[in-house]
Amino acid sequence: MNNWNSITIKISREAGEAISALLIEAGSAGVEINDSADYLNHEDQFGEVLPEIEQSDFVEITAYYPENMPIVELKAEIEHKIANLSDYFSLTGLSVTTNNLSETNWAEAWKKYFEPARITHDLTIVPSWTEDYVATGSEKLIRLDPGMAFGTGTHPTTKMSLYALEQVLRGGETLLDVGTGSGVLSVAASYLGAAEIFAYDIDEVAVRVALENIELNPGHEKIHVSANNLLEGIDKKADVIVANILADILVLMTEDAFRLVKEEGYLIMSGIIADKADMVIASAEKAGFFLETRMIQGEWNCLIFKKTENREGVIGG
């Protein structure tokens, strides 16, 4: 019998991915995210009976830690780190609670909740331990270990990023993946024909996770992963830059992105809550980009900008 402590955080949905990363960094063996939007936005394709869920602006994130870790001190440390993030998102309604539980082989049992998920017409995310799933037709399998960090790749912001990559990649491109997290976007770009991919993350844990996930997939030799703060100090010119991170962070990189994107190239920005989309658009347009496509799923936005002198077909052009 394995004993575990859990820390559950209730916080605004916008902060969910950042808090998940923080909990993993603090040593969590796994993170569970309970989000009502996952049910409300779910497309019933297989006759599933889903529970009645009331819309909420909050998510509950539960992280699991071995019992021998000092949970009281750990809770205090996590609360301190969350407080330091108040400049980036609202902490209104925040709650942090702890619990003790016993579970036989918990580290394996949680895996039953993650199943293969068809994300786009051609891309399906498959847990690394699912060996019997066979691709059909043009389907390409992205293998991930979602227990390592950063979820399963099925969040609306990730889905829209994948759709955006399908829209702009034609083959042979150089791509920069900023805030790579699980590495899912880099793997997808490889499948979609990008010739050279550079993935960056400021978090060393994310760099390790991305490397491990990328190596689960074919074509990993053309993906280069390293620690870096956004695009600071990067000189590599790219046909496409993609970033799925917080809106307040995205606006810090628009000028560097414009410097690095080749003429007629694209900047894909996702992870944007609806009420901050205009802020991101203004920042990118000020840098010199034109908004070409705006995708919306629920309260999330994904924006595709183009660096071009020809405004025909561009929003506002």
UniProtKB/Swiss-Prot annotation:
Q: Which reaction does it catalyse?
A: L-lysyl-[protein] + 3 S-adenosyl-L-methionine = N(6),N(6),N(6)-trimethyl-L-lysyl-[protein] + 3 S-adenosyl-L-homocysteine + 3 H(+)
Q: What is its EC number?
A: 2.1.1.-
The residues listed in the UniProt record as binding S-adenosyl-L-methionine, with positions renumbered to this chain, are T158, G179, D201, N244
> Which biological process terms from the Gene Ontology are attached to this UniProt entry?
methylation
InterPro entries reported in the protein's UniProt record: Ribosomal_L11_MeTrfase_PrmA, Ribosomal_PrmA_MeTrfase, SAM-dependent_MTases_sf
Note the superkingdom of the native organism: Bacteria
Q: Which HAMAP family match?
A: Methyltr_PrmA (MF_00735)
Role played: Methylates ribosomal protein L11.
Q: What is this protein called?
A: Ribosomal protein L11 methyltransferase
Which source organism does the UniProt entry give? Lactococcus lactis subsp. lactis (strain IL1403) (Streptococcus lactis)
